[in-house]
Amino acid sequence: MMKELRFYNTLTRKKENFIPIDPTKVRLYVCGPTVYDYAHIGNARPLIVFDILFRLLRHVYGSDHVLYARNITDVDDKINARAACEYPNLPLNEAIRQLTERTYFQFQQDTIALGCLLPTSQPRATEHLEEMRALIERLLEKGHAYKAENHILFSISSIKNPPHYGAFANRSLDEMRAGARIDVAAYKREEMDFVLWKPSAEGEPGWKSPGGIPVLGRPGWHIECSAMSMAKLLAPYGGGLTCDDPIANIFDIHGGGLDLIFPHHENEIAQSCSAFGTERMANFWMHNGFLQVEGKKMSKSFGNFITIRSVLENNFLEFNGALAYEIKQNWAGLSARFSMLQTHYREPLNWTAQRLMQSSSELYRWYELLRDKKSMMENNEAIEDTLIDALSDDLNTPKAFTLLRKFYKAGDALALANGMNLLGLLRQEWIKEIDCPLFIKKTSLDSKFIEQCIAERLRLIHNKEWGAADKIRNELAAEGILLKDGKDPQSGKRITVWEIKRF
């Protein structure tokens, strides 16, 4: 019997059973990066969240029956500006090429280090300009778009049938006018109309314009995703502009961050539904929550802007020189993944250096168990039903981690390894390589003894035997073990985690 999946659907604002349009080709689209700068840790969150969704769907429906498209935006005004700034001595188009190739390559390295599977496809905007022009032509023909001063704009007032503009974001037009930063150009009929195509200035990248416009131009941001999702998830399966059946022009899941709900996803829906005559673009919309750094909004002005690359390169760990090079490069990535997955994807996430260190220490202890029991681990990929149940309930990764900790505590290396594999935390080859110490100075105590000491100390604290409890802490500290007390976020009980001191 196929596992029942339930996800929170932003479209309906409630948790619903997920039933794919066709279980032999489950289709997922996620908005990817604009390659003008290195991805930051806020970008890492949707990468990891939707990788978990991709892994779960593959587990339930089969790896050959899930199609995951994540786009690459390589046409954008921010790209033009950054390229001109970083490569002032190059022609703009060459500068853009160098910038986008460099940042695209780093993005791929980042996603691999974070433990993410490659999507089925990663369409680039520049590879789908023909589809964008065709989609804009369709909107012009149907009266949903108009030309003005060599621009083509989407007409909000042209929408007469559901979904009405603003319904997805749950905002009225007045609220959107008041809350959005809108470029009210003189050529717009209404202030909320948005650009589908714009003219390119001399020297800027430009392509043949739709609608008979005589000058070269480039697409707006929103039309890119409508066109690329059509190209990868609709047209190959009977949908697209040559199909008159609205049902064939809907796919299963569209994902992204909360910050994309308005205006980007609202505008995607307006474009796609108007072009195809559908009431929805995708049946499910899933959005991950925001990320803060040390309790503050991440911002260059706050000095807390952290790129994924900086996490990977400026390692927060001191590695033993004998440790395999790949582990040195990717341990920080898996530690970041471990840290992020402990918070439910729809909840706000507070990124802290302390939490990252704790995640790294715990992940290492898990690998130690796998190393110690590797001879007992059979070639068995069966995953505990309880773990699948947790992820099937709106990707409940905190509950999944509770189960993994139980497997670890019970010494069940096989269940732990299979669960880690599903969550993208397992590198089989590392189990062999990790025989050498991770840290430059490693304690002589084994992890089992340390856990026993922690349990005894917690008992002493419960009995208010403070002196004896402090003695255990001090003795462990002398061996290079740092104890950190806190509360379990679910039970509220006192817990203690440990890590090896940095020297």
Swiss-Prot record:
Main localisation: cytoplasm
Residues reported to bind Zn(2+): 31, 225, 264, 268
Enzyme class: ligase
Annotated localization: Cytoplasm
An annotated GO cellular component: cytosol
GO biological process terms held by the UniProt record: cysteinyl-tRNA aminoacylation
UniProt keyword list: Aminoacyl-tRNA synthetase, ATP-binding, Cytoplasm, Ligase, Metal-binding, Nucleotide-binding, Protein biosynthesis, Zinc
Residue numbers binding ATP: 300
EC code: 6.1.1.16
Short sequence motif named 'KMSKS' region, residue ranges: 297-301
Alphabetical list of InterPro entries matching this protein: Cys-tRNA-ligase, Cys-tRNA/MSH_ligase, Rossmann-like_a/b/a_fold, tRNA-synt_1_cat_dom, tRNAsynth_Ia_anticodon-bd
Molecular-function GO terms, alphabetical: ATP binding; cysteine-tRNA ligase activity; zinc ion binding
Bound cofactor: record note: Binds 1 zinc ion per subunit.
Domain of life: Bacteria
SUPFAM superfamilies linked: Anticodon-binding domain of a subclass of class I aminoacyl-tRNA synthetases (SSF47323), Nucleotidylyl transferase (SSF52374)
Catalysed conversion reaction: tRNA(Cys) + L-cysteine + ATP = L-cysteinyl-tRNA(Cys) + AMP + diphosphate
Motif 'HIGH' region per UniProt: ranges: 33-43
Pfam families: tRNA-synt_1e (PF01406)
Cofactor (UniProt): Zn(2+)
UniProt subunit comment: Monomer.
Similarity comment text for this entry: Belongs to the class-I aminoacyl-tRNA synthetase family.
Protein name listed in UniProt: Cysteine--tRNA ligase
Annotated gene: cysS
